[in-house]
A protein has these predicted regions:
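Residues within the helices of the helix-turn-helix
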Residues: 339
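DNA-recognition helix of helix-turn-helix
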Residues: 343-369
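C-terminal lobe/tail of nucleotide-utilizing enzymes
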Residues: 177-291, 295
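A short pre-motif secondary-structure segment
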Residues: 327-331
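N-terminal phosphate/diphosphate-binding loop that engages ATP/GTP or pyrophosphate donors
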Residues: 26-90
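Conserved catalytic-core segment of NTP-binding enzymes
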Residues: 118-128, 133-224
Length: 370
């Protein structure tokens, strides 16, 4: 039987990995074979799960193996931990990503899933795969489980602050969008972590039509457990909450939500009255520091420069030969392919390329020398 796949999304720093880790541990205590998949470039999802030991990431291992022209194997990137008192080992993977400022995190997620799918991840003898996903960025890579229906179910994690709820709302909207174009991921509901009793996240959930699955109160002892790379479910009051949620998931007691998310104005009005007035525009005078009565000649001059460049280019094009003009306009302005231009003008593709090349060289000369 294929593994049950659940993507857990939330704003960075709100306890998303804490939630995922303790849910993984709870499933393992229920004799389920669990794989926790860290899908954040920070690659810290499984740190507590593995007692503080960092896992080599798929991104790094793939780069090293690729440099040596060697294939990536399961044992290179999948790790297990046997824990006393747990009937099943817990498995972990960190996708990782590029170093800060050196690449695209979303692209790293896409590439990581490509590697895992080639290794047959969805055919492994695993009961549940929990995917711990960053939800802060509007990036197609981080929406991979939703876009490709790699996760059957989605759980949102939030606190009672506006920014974390806003992130949850964005993910809800994204999941709804992908469902409208054939996506199969179902939204199970919302977990409120570090609940302060203010009820803000609950008001949002009610307005958006999202089920509140669990409320985890702020607990200093739970924080200390996590900070020392241990499980908060060792605390009875925390364990009880996670056990109930895990049991509800396993026994299919949760009805998926049909929520589409709130639009922006509907969202912000949850936090207070907001005026319908349009924002007040700034003026060029105040930004350029002009005194009242000065002309706006800088703005006009800047626009004139842009206009004159376009006009100059058009004049240069008109100086090309008729054949060069025809090919250049079709390729550069009408965005036709070389093969299409060749067919329309009854020329060989090589002839079209030569005309295009000569036209570009001539335009460069005319524009900068004219």
């Amino acid at each position: 039987m294929a593994a049950r796949t659940i993507a857990i999304y939330g704003k960075g720093g709100i306890g998303k990995s804490f939630t995922t880790t303790n849910l993984s541990a709870t499933f393992a205590l229920m004799n389920k074979r669990v794989l926790q998949l860290g899908c954040d470039p920070k690659h810290d999802s499984t740190t507590s799960l593995f007692g503080g030991i960092p896992l080599p990431t798929v991104t790094d291992v793939f780069a090293e193996k690729n440099a040596l022209n060697q294939p990536v194997s399961i044992s290179d990137i999948v790790f297990r931990r046997d824990i006393a008192g747990f009937p099943q080992p817990i498995y972990g993977i960190e996708l990782g990503g590029p170093q800060v400022g050196r690449g695209c995190g979303g692209r790293g997620i896409i590439s990581g899933f490509d590697v895992l799918e080639k290794l047959g991840i969805f055919n492994w003898d695993i009961d549940i795969i929990l995917m711990d996903f960053l939800g802060d960025v509007v990036c197609g890579g981080f929406a991979t489980p939703l876009a490709r229906s790699l996760s059957e179910e989605v759980i949102l994690v939030t606190n009672n602050d506006r920014q974390s709820i806003f992130t949850a709302n964005n993910i809800c909207q994204a999941n709804n969008y992908f469902r409208t174009i054939g996506g199969q991921s179902r939204l199970l509901g919302l977990i409120i972590n570090r609940d302060d009793g203010s009820g803000v996240a609950e008001r949002y959930a009610e307005a958006a039509g999202i089920t509140v699955l669990m409320k985890v109160p702020y607990d200093a002892d739970a924080r200390d457990k996590d900070d020392s790379f241990d499980f908060a479910i060792r605390l009875p009051e925390i364990r009880e909450k996670f056990q109930k949620l895990a049991q509800d998931i396993v026994e299919d007691r949760i009805t998926p939500c049909e929520a589409v998310g709130l639009d922006f104005m509907g969202f912000v009005r949850l936090f207070g009255e907001v005026s319908d007035d349009a924002p007040q525009p700034a003026t060029a005078d105040e930004l350029f520091g002009r005194k009242q009565g000065d002309s706006g000649s800088e703005t006009i001059a800047q626009k004139s420069t842009l206009d004159s460049d376009d006009q100059k280019m058009n004049r240069c094009i008109e100086k090309l030969t008729a054949e060069q003009q025809e090919v250049y306009r079709m390729v550069e302005q009408e965005k036709k392919a070389i093969s299409e231009v060749a067919e329309l003008t009854h020329r060989e593709k090589s002839a079209v390329r030569e005309l295009l090349s000569s036209a570009r060289k001539e335009l460069t000369r005319l524009f900068f020398e004219g």
